[in-house]
Each structure stands twice: as C-alpha cells, then as structure tokens.
Design a protein with these regions (language model features):
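Glycine- and charge-enriched low-complexity intrinsically disordered segments
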Residues: 378-381
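Short beta-strand and beta-hairpin "edge-sheet" elements
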Residues: 83-112, 199, 344-374
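Acidic, small/polar-enriched beta strand-loop surface segments
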Residues: 1-29, 188, 212-364
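Residues that flank catalytic or metal-binding motifs in active/ligand-binding sites
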Residues: 94, 194, 202-204, 240-242, ...
Length: 381
C-alpha cells in the first residue's frame, strides 16, 4: 500500500474532502505545471500490461509543442484526502503518457497509460545480445535506453544480484524485462527468471517486486460497513495450475538446470495436487483421494541458470496460478493508497473475514467509492 497516515486511513469512512491534482511535463518529469482538473478515473490493475491507466478531462490547457500534446507530454495525478483540522494528504494516482487526446468543448479528454507503455513502444531496431551481467545491470540498460534517468526499485525478496547469461532480445524490450517469448518461442524476461514481476508504480518508478501471495501481511481491513454494495463471489478454473515444472535451458548444449517442481501440498485446499505428484503420482488413487486433479504448467528459460533460481521461479509461478478460480467483487469506500497485489481482509458476511489479494481497484477521481476485484485461495468445504 502507498504511504498514508493513520489519521487519513481512519477517516476514509467519514465525510472527507477529496480534491484532485493534475500536473503535466514536457521534459521527462524534471519540471511540472499544474493543470485544471475536470473529471476522470483511474484503473490500477495487476493483470494489465500497464499497471495504471486513466481517463481524464483537463480544462483549457495550453496545447501544441509547448503545451499538452500526445508525443512528449507526461501526466501526474494525485488524489487528495482532506481530514478535518489537517492539511490535505496527497496520494499518487499514477504517472502517465498520453495514449489518445481529444479536443472537447471545455478542454481536452485524455486516455492515459502508465510508463510501461514508453518501454513497450521502444522496440529494438535490431536484435541484440544483452549480458552476461547481473539482473540489475541488464535491467538498468534496457530501461535506461527507453526512459533516460528513470530510477528502478528492487523490492526486498527479489534477487537482483543474480548473474544472468548472455541472451538475445529480438525486438520486444518490455518482454525482455517482464516475461514473454521471443520469435523462436523461447521464454524470456528478467523478472520472470527471478520469480518476480515488474511494473511502473503509482509514482512512475519502474519496480521489480516479488509475486504477491496471500501469506503477505494484511495492509487494510474492510469491515462490512465500509462496503457500499453486497460482495459478489465467483469461481472459475481458468488459468489454474497446481503443479509447475521449471527448467533452465540455454539451447547451447550445456547441461540443463532443473527441473524444479512446486505443487499445492495443502490437503485442505481444493487445488491439492496430492502428496507428491512427481515421484508418486498414484498416491491419490491408493489413498482414496478421488477429488485430486493435477493441472501441470511448464516454464523453460535460458535465463534460469541455477537450481535455486529454478526453485524460486517455480514457487512464484505456483503462487500466481493458485486461487485465481475464487474471486470476490465488491464496492467499498475509496482508499486511493491501495495498490494491486496488496492483501486485504474483507468481512464477507457478518463475522466472516477472508484474506483477499487485490487484482484491480478502479475509482473515480474525487469519488468516495471504489470497485475491487480480488482473488483468494480455496479450501475444501
């Protein structure tokens, strides 16, 4: 969760002022100019390639080369919380580039995307070899070429000092940083090879962070009186994997790393994969565990060079693919400090509290409510 004072957090359910601040810059964020905000909304979404997106209308801004344009202009948004007898507390609501600009009667309407879009658009003109070097140094080069001078944050738990072998980046700079496949179908991605994820946060900083899990600390409790609509529960098995097999293969004929295995070993879980689906796949039949279903996923990357690294990736993949079939949608009072990947505790019904991981939490700037989409682990009924 973004920094927020205890007083502001406690006042979210009360009558508070919700001012909005918008700023624009044409020099990469070295200087900022205030803009008159009309209306708009922000969509933080962990499942989107750009973690933050927004749509806003600005009133009578300057236009053209020295004003707001769709080529060089970057936009910063802030949601304020006005607690009585205290100064307004400003919470970052995203640092954006302009995807689309439309002239309106009162000013301009803007569709905005996070700074990932700059990196995504800066494709390599020719294939290039990156490394061998540490993950931090490889990421610094790829990010710095697209966003000169941009800081990179490495959250605790991400092993940025991991040595990576030389690898070829065909075109897609963002895939080389986050994850994907090259033109030959080989898995790439510095973050994926570390069992991590990468995104531009609400302040515009490119961030490498561990894949969030429900074991992370709870950042906010949402009692029933904070909800403005009845929670809606939903289940689907789309994207469910309860056994991951991870290997490292450079394709050069050298020894293959792994395989590393990770599976759901909790007998109380609906997605339980059995006591050992690798060494003893017949155990569920022998033990009468007729409800066990194994769903296997595989990941191979030339950037995985040690057994420990393969183990980390397998655990991260498992954490990200379990529980996606159990989700909760609800509308609550707006907490602009909430980030995708945060773990919250929700009072689903009277006295029944559940841990949920925030996937998305869109809200109207200046509004008092937000719509949350979450997921959680499933347990046997």
């Amino acid at each position: 969760m973004l920094p927020i004072s205890p007083a502001a957090l406690a006042a979210l359910g009360q009558a508070t002022r919700r001012p909005v601040r918008a700023q624009w810059s044409n020099d990469g964020g070295r200087t900022w100019t205030d803009a008159r905000f009309g209306s708009g909304s922000v969509t933080p979404d962990r499942t989107a390639e750009c973690r933050y997106s927004a749509s806003v209308e600005l009133l009578a801004p300057p236009r053209g080369r020295s004003g707001i344009n769709s080529i060089t202009t970057e936009i910063r948004l802030f949601q304020g919380i006005g607690v009585p007898r205290r100064d307004v507390e400003w919470i970052p609501a995203g640092w954006y580039v302009i995807d689309r600009l439309k002239q309106t009667r009162l000013g301009v309407s803007l569709d905005l995307l996070g700074r990932e879009d700059v990196i995504r658009g800066a494709s390599l003109p020719t294939a290039r070899t990156v490394g061998p070097d540490t993950a931090k140094e490889c990421a610094r080069v790829l990010v710095g070429e697209a966003l000169p001078g941009a800081p990179i944050a490495w959250r605790s738990g991400v092993k940025g000092s991991t040595a990576l072998p030389a690898f070829v980046v065909d075109e897609d700079r963002w895939a080389a940083l986050s994850g994907g496949t090259d033109t030959s179908g080989v898995s790439t991605g510095i973050a994926a090879s570390l069992g991590a994820e990468v995104y531009a946060d609400a302040t515009g900083i490119v961030t490498f962070a561990p894949v969030p899990t429900l074991a992370d600390p709870v950042v906010w409790q949402i009692p029933r009186h904070f909800a403005t609509a009845e929670p809606s529960e939903e289940e689907t098995n789309e994207g469910l994997v309860n056994l991951w097999v991870v290997t490292g293969d450079s394709g050069s004929g050298s020894a293959t790393v792994g395989p590393a295995y990770a599976w759901d070993d909790d007998p109380a879980s609906l997605t339980y994969a059995g006591p050992d689906p690798v060494a003893d796949p017949l155990a569920p039949q022998r033990l009468g565990l007729h409800g066990v279903r194994v769903r296997t996923g595989r990941y191979t990357s030339p950037l995985v060079t040690t057994q420990g690294q393969a183990d980390d990736v397998a655990q991260a993949k498992l954490a990200d693919s379990l529980g996606v079939q159990a989700s909760l949608s609800f509308t609550s009072v707006c907490n602009p400090a909430l980030e995708p990947g945060d773990v919250v505790e929700v009072e689903v019904s009277e006295g029944r509290w559940e841990r949920h991981l925030i996937d998305s939490s869109p809200y109207a700037l200046g509004g008092v409510s937000m719509a949350c989409q979450t997921r959680t682990s499933t347990r046997r009924l």
